[in-house]
């Protein structure tokens, strides 16, 4: 008979290969698969591998014009999820040739582009990716990284302090600049545009950039420290985004900001390249992440979005707090915080890390803790995140009863007290409250802050837990 065998056949015949030895150059993915009733896990896992690589629903004659064995994704291992009915972790290996070099956009289009609407699955979640060194090397990564940032700012041996300017919408540019100045003068390293602040009728971007730059230079002159304000360059088109970044560079400011999920990976990578070429640091906000990562059985875990950001490029990224008003279980959060900062991360399922990841020499990203935190959290934050982090207190600075500058003073005093106590060998986890109370003696600003927030807690059960 001439031709090929037409018709529909089971995916598992071609795409489930339990004997496959993964290659060092493969991209590996761990999917949490919830098959529809009656669909065997092997078929579900194979379907994911097929639909996110070379497969389609029926045999096609053009299959004969290529080598499926060379290009197909393979489901090479399946394990049931402990404590969950009908959930499995399916491990899929993708040959590197399926992906365009240096394109996070293409990587995601391939791996998570189509398969999440697949009918044979009730739900699907991408838990982790192993990016091979061969692929890592095709990305520029963060514009500068942790060490270069410290050198630029001349700030060592402690976490950096930030503050998001509130109310986030409605201030005029001049009043906004005033708020920035007060915070920086009081002792913060950075202030931040809120992620929703782009260029609205009440405050156009160019006016804001100019007033913030003025605030920055005034605060620098008064304090003798380098200051920064994250100027949000996010815009409706890539050209407009670049125009804003160029203007920021012309003003001579040290850092700009981007919302990488709403802005998109293509825009983000473009901006990251510009930032490296022009000496700008890049702060990344993760607006929209919870739409993708909050459901336990469907979507993508934030650790995947964090890896993607390190490849696309950013010097800071928001990463939850463990202690404030937003999600983040401690071990899981520290898992992806280490993925952002370190060169090499061992597989460790207790922290949700499914694969060993080697970033070789790609620069690291500073995790930003932000959301509902205040001076009483400082010992815990210093202990959990360590020196290489940015701690951001929005309401925890601007909500100070005496104003922004005293709010900034309170945070800086609390931070310096915690760092000193840690360096003297004290246990921040146990003696934290005591350390803050002692520091209050020398700082009326801190004492006032401690009084305001002594009872505030945001306590709900975490959603993001290991099984």
From Swiss-Prot:
Tell me its cofactors: Mg(2+)
What gene codes for this chain?
Answer: rbcL
Q: Which GO terms describe its molecular function?
A: magnesium ion binding; monooxygenase activity; ribulose-bisphosphate carboxylase activity
Q: Which PANTHER family match?
A: RIBULOSE BISPHOSPHATE CARBOXYLASE (PTHR42704), RIBULOSE BISPHOSPHATE CARBOXYLASE LARGE CHAIN (PTHR42704:SF15)
Q: Which residues carry this modification: N6-carboxylysine?
A: 192
Cite the EC number: 4.1.1.39
Q: Which organism is it from?
A: Tasmannia insipida
Family membership, please give it: Belongs to the RuBisCO large chain family. Type I subfamily.
Q: Which residues bind substrate?
A: 114, 164, 168, 286, 318, 370
Q: What is the lineage of its organism?
A: Eukaryota, Viridiplantae, Streptophyta, Embryophyta, Tracheophyta
Q: Where in the cell is it found?
A: Plastid, Chloroplast
**Miscellaneous comment:** The basic functional RuBisCO is composed of a large chain homodimer in a 'head-to-tail' conformation. In form I RuBisCO this homodimer is arranged in a barrel-like tetramer with the small subunits forming a tetrameric 'cap' on each end of the 'barrel'.
What GO cellular component entries does it have?
chloroplast
Protein name, per record? Ribulose bisphosphate carboxylase large chain
Predominant location category: plastid
Q: Where are the transmembrane segments?
A: none
Its keywords, alphabetically, are: Calvin cycle, Carbon dioxide fixation, Chloroplast, Disulfide bond, Lyase, Magnesium, Metal-binding, Methylation, Monooxygenase, Oxidoreductase, Photorespiration, Photosynthesis, Plastid
**Where, by residue number, is the active site?**
166, 285
Please describe the post-translational modifications of this protein.
The disulfide bond which can form in the large chain dimeric partners within the hexadecamer appears to be associated with oxidative stress and protein turnover.
């Amino acid at each position: 008979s001439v031709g090929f065998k037409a018709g529909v056949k089971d995916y598992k015949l071609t795409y489930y290969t339990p004997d496959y030895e993964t290659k060092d150059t493969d991209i590996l993915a761990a999917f949490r698969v919830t098959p529809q009733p009656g669909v065997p896990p092997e078929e579900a896992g194979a379907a994911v591998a097929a639909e996110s690589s070379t497969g389609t629903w029926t045999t096609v004659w053009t299959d004969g014009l290529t080598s499926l064995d060379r290009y197909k994704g393979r489901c090479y291992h399946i394990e049931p999820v402990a404590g969950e009915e009908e959930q499995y972790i399916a491990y899929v290996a993708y040959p590197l040739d399926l992906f365009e070099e240096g394109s996070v956009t293409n990587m995601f289009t391939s791996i998570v582009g189509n398969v999440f609407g697949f009918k044979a699955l009730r739900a699907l979640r991408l838990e982790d990716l192993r990016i091979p060194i061969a692929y890592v090397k095709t990305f520029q990564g963060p514009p500068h990284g942790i060490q270069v940032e410290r050198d630029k700012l001349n700030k060592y041996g402690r976490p950096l302090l930030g503050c998001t300017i509130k109310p986030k919408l409605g201030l005029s540019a001049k009043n906004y600049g005033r708020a920035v100045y007060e915070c920086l003068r009081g002792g913060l390293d950075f202030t931040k545009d809120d992620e929703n602040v782009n260029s609205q009728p009440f405050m156009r971007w160019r006016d804001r950039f100019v007033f913030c730059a003025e605030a920055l230079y005034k605060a620098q002159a008064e304090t003798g420290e380098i200051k920064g304000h994250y100027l949000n360059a996010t815009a409706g088109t890539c050209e407009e985004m670049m125009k804003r970044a160029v203007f920021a560079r012309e003003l001579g400011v040290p850092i700009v900001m981007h919302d990488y999920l709403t802005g998109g990976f293509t825009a983000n990578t473009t901006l990251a390249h510009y930032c490296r070429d022009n000496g700008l640091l890049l702060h990344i906000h993760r607006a929209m992440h919870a739409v993708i990562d909050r459901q336990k059985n469907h979507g993508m875990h934030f650790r995947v979005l964090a890896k993607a950001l390190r490849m696309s490029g950013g010097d800071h990224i928001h990463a939850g707090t463990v202690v404030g008003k937003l999600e983040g279980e401690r071990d899981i959060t520290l898992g992806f915080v280490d993925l952002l900062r370190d060169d090499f991360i061992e597989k460790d399922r207790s922290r949700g890390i499914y694969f060993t990841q080697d970033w070789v020499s790609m620069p690291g990203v500073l995790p930003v803790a932000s959301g509902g935190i205040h001076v009483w959290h400082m010992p815990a934050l210093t202990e959990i995140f360590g020196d290489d982090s940015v701690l951001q207190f929005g309401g925890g600075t601007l909500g100070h009863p005496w104003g922004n500058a005293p709010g900034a003073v309170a945070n800086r005093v609390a931070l310096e007290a915690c760092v000193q106590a840690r360096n003297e060998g004290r246990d921040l986890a146990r003696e934290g409250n005591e350390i803050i109370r002692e520091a209050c003696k020398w700082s009326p600003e801190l004492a006032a802050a401690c009084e305001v927030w002594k009872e505030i807690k945001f306590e709900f059960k975490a959603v993001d837990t290991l099984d």
